[in-house]
Structures are given as structure tokens and as C-alpha cells.
Amino acid sequence: MVKKYTGQNVYDAFQQRMHFIFKEFDNIFVSFSGGKDSGALLNLVLDFQEKYYPDKKIGVFHQDFEAQYTVTTEYVEKTFARLENKAELYWVCLPMATRTALSSYEMFWYPWDDVKKDAWVRPMPQHPYVINMENNPITTYRYKMHQEDLAKQFSRWYRISHNNKKTVCLLGTRAEESIQRYSGILYKKYGYKGECWIARQFKDVWTASPMYDWL
């Protein structure tokens, strides 16, 4: 598909998409990895929400992989501390299957494996918004499920726990990152009201990539 440029800049296009999202969906949360794209997305969404919907709280979902960059965890710590009274925070530290190339014998590694606590590479974060095996409210979670499934099932649980109303997970995905992401956004079989950057996951659960055309 040939790119077609318009006279609108990506920031104004993002604002337009946010108006659409907040109008169409009852429950909104941001998937925040602690990386630059999801960090930019989170701050842009919060700025929009504070300006146009000051009485509405959004959710922030962080999927902790235990063995991740120290500066990433530090950034997540600072961000969550700043948002503690401004957003619904979900810092998920549950056992999940992640593919590994570090072993010749095992296909998966399990962050936060509750039967191997002595092998954890860092201590469990200690905050009231941290979700682990001792306090897990996510009813759609299955023990040691794949990491991708955990993220999807969190979205489903978020809808269930918020009155089963229409829910959207905002992603910092950019089409420019790779051909796979480019085609994944532009060639979606099922969009939402003609918008290719929104995709259906489950009944009344969607994902949206409002920064998809950012460079």
C-alpha cells in the first residue's frame, strides 16, 4: 500500500483519535511497558484526559517480566508513584510463559515463578498496586499462561471488573517499526467503524494504536 500524506500533523491526528476513543469506549487503559513508545503514549493520553475528561480515570497496565532493564523498572516505579492518585494502576507480576533462547532443554522461562522464589533475579516490587500470586484478582488468569494470553485476558478481566462495558486497551505500536507491524495495522480484517488502528480482541474488548503513524 502506498503512503498518502495529508496536511495534518501526527499530534493533531492523535488528538482527533483520542476524542473518538473517549466518545466510543467506556473503559480505557494504557498498556505501559516502560519503553519510549508506551511512555510517550501514556503521557499524551493523560494530558488529553486531564484537559477534556478530568473526572474520568484511566487504567495503566504494566506486565513485569522480572528480568528486565534496571532503568526500565526505575522508570515504571517513578511513573506509577506519580500516578498513584490519578489513575487505576495494575503492576502485574504473575508467573507466565515467555519464550527463551538461553536453554537447550526448556522452551519457556517463567518470570515470577512462585515455586522458584530463590531463583528470582530481583525482589518482588512492594506496592499496593502490584498484582502477584498472593493477591491476584484477575479471574481470567490461568497459571503460567503465555505472556501474550495474559495481556489479552487482563483486557477481558478489565471489562468484567468495570461493569462489562465497552473496553479498549491503548498500545504504543507504530507501523514504522517493522513491515509486520505496518501490515498488521493497515490490513486488519476487522477494524472498528472503519478505523484500521482499532482491532477486536473479544466481545466488547478492543485494542487501539493511536500513534500508529508516528515515525
What are the functions of these language-model segments?
Residues M1-S31, K36-L215:
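Nucleotide-activated chemistry modules centered on ATP-dependent adenylation/adenylyltransferase
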